[in-house]
């Protein structure tokens, strides 16, 4: 049985929502065990609450060492100036021990993201995230154009061949659209299917 981890950081709930739909897609694949976890918050709780960060999230906090237990990891992060959020970077910067052991070599790595604006760095966030995964020897998986939501020209929408994305709006008021959530589910299903093949 393939084991898939959906691991995310979410400030205001947009990436959390995307993660939940990625889990839904992954769970639609028979013979796959799917786990949803988040990385630790690095902002002190009182300060985080004061700026509107969604501190209370149902997903348990992951540990670095457990990453080696999964056949595929789908990472989710909001964008910070075209890069992953500092909380995710801090977590990944602790994976040196896993790198030394080659613990993630051959495992699937996939990424999804959220930005405040339509051209706010979704693709650079995901592709720069890939650099870390490649250093770990992971096999990168995105979202193929077999996913029809990628070519939706009828609305402003996230979604790239590099991974599912959503647009939060500058004030965070926009929630993931139906199309964006469909792409997220597709990514989860696609990764889970490939993880099953690699694990067999």
Curated annotation (Swiss-Prot):
Coiled-coil ranges per UniProt: none
One of the record's GO molecular function terms: NADP binding
InterPro entries for this protein: Flavodoxin/NO_synth, Flavoprotein-like_sf, Flavoprotein_WrbA-like, FMN_Rdtase-like_dom, NQO
One Pfam entry name: FMN_red
Disulfide bonds: none
Protein EC: 1.6.5.2
HAMAP family given in the database record: NQOR (MF_01017)
Protein name, entry field: NAD(P)H dehydrogenase (quinone)
């Amino acid at each position: 049985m393939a084991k898939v981890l959906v691991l995310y950081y979410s400030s205001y709930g947009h990436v959390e929502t995307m993660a939940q739909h990625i889990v839904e897609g992954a769970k639609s694949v028979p013979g796959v065990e799917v786990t949803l976890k988040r990385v630790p918050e690095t902002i002190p709780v009182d300060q985080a609450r004061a700026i509107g960060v969604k501190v209370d999230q149902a997903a348990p906090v992951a540990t670095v060492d457990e990453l080696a237990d999964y056949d595929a990891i789908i990472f989710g992060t909001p964008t910070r100036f075209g890069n992953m959020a500092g909380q995710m970077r801090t977590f990944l910067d602790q994976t040196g021990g896993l790198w030394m052991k080659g613990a993630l070599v051959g495992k699937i790595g996939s990424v999804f993201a959220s930005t405040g604006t339509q051209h706010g760095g979704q693709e650079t966030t995901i592709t720069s995230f890939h650099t870390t995964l490649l250093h770990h020897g992971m096999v990168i998986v995105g979202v193929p154009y077999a996913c029809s939501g990628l070519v939706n020209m009828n609305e402003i929408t996230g979604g790239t061949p590099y991974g599912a994305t959503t647009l939060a709006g500058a004030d965070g008021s926009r929630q993931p659209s139906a199309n964006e959530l469909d792409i997220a589910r597709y990514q989860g299903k696609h990764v889970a299917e490939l993880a099953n093949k690699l694990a067999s």
